[in-house]
Amino acid sequence: MRITNKEQLTAHGNREGRKIVAELLDAGLDALDPYVRVKQLVHVENGKIVLHTDGFEMKGDPHAGPLEFDLKDYDRVYVIGAAKGVQRAALAMEEALGDVLTGGHVIAKHGEDIICKKIGVTLAGHPVPDEACVEGCKKIEALARDITSRDLVFTITGSGCGSLMTYPADDITIDEIARFTHMMQIEKGVPTSDLNPIRTHIDRFKGGRLSRL
């Protein structure tokens, strides 16, 4: 139950109607929870990591069916990422993979409780990035530079990643990016979709650069 004041909400007015609406909202929140969805998607079966659930497939998709990674082909398994809800997905990966998981690092938003146990967590600034974003990126960078062709890396991204995974390019400071972001998004209301193309030119990770380390 995610609606913590359900009894209060359904104690007056059209009680039956309110109860139905509360249950619908609760079911919707469960369906959108990264933890719930990842636990449905990720499994370890017969020495393989299997990504599959019918709920994630589009009708007629030519690539339908499970995606499998044979563990004998990999020495280590990592999880990295950044998003406002990244810890829920990362925790699900921890539980689904169990001892198969080597470790990893994710960047989440300031104010969250740290719930991951095996995957490291940095709490950082959103929507305006801060120095903690850089520190989190450095930890991911160190991990990425140690990756070999015998390692399997799962990357979790989502809403907020553009800010949380901020790693300024050479000759640009985090303070400059913070001021730029505040001006564009907080003061001017520029959509994130318009800001992201600019970010690719001033960041060490964006534009696919992280995958090329």
Regions found by a protein language model. Give the residues of each.
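N-terminal loops that bind phosphate or other acidic moieties
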Residues: 1-157, 161-213
